[in-house]
Amino acid sequence: MQNKDNKFLIVGLVDDFIDQLSADLAYDNNLYYLNVENLINYSILEKQKLIDTCGVEYFKKQEEKIISSLKDYENIIACIKYSTFVEYCDKLRGIFNIVYFEIDEKNIKENKRNKFATENLNRIAFAERDKFLKNNCDITLKCDINNMKQNLKAFKAIQF
């Protein structure tokens, strides 16, 4: 089994918020920050061209290699889009301590930070995604999309 000390994957329902939160958490805890989506996009520069030339199956194999390579990182806080997390959840569970920063629907609707594009989730999709994350993460932390300091404090309080 992989040593998961100081290896955290941050997930949530609002990708832009999770990206910013992860960067802040990494800085605040003196850990390396990695956006998994950016790593995939950087590693596979011309995604559509690769798919057109080699097919979706080949692209998925390349993407899976990148996900597997995350095991080599240490002292890291990474973030990932919900859709990618769903696809590689089992593999990621063996690599990271996975933390779900839960935002309730009311908090999303009251979002004061315009820079976080709150996804237009209907109630059914919100409930399904929330349930999936709660069932597939090591820890769930309630958070406030409008209070980053509170979220950083909640993360510091967890013990693995």
Features from the language model and the residues they span:
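Phosphate-binding beta-loop-alpha motif at adenosine-nucleotide cofactor sites
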Residues: N135-N151
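Short, charged, surface-exposed secondary-structure boundary motifs
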Residues: S43-L45, N107-R113, N151-L152
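Short, well-ordered beta-strand core segments
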Residues: I76, N97-Y100, I139-L141
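Pre-Walker A (Motif I) flank of P-loop NTPase domains
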Residues: N3-F8, E74
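Short glycine-rich anion-binding loops that position phosphate/pyrophosphate groups of nucleotides
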Residues: K81-F85, D104-K106, N146
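A glycine- and Lys/Arg-enriched "phosphate-lid" helix/loop adjacent to the NTP-binding pocket
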Residues: I95-N135
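Glycine-rich phosphate-binding P-loop
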Residues: F8-A26
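ATP-dependent small-molecule kinase phosphotransfer cores
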Residues: Y32-K91
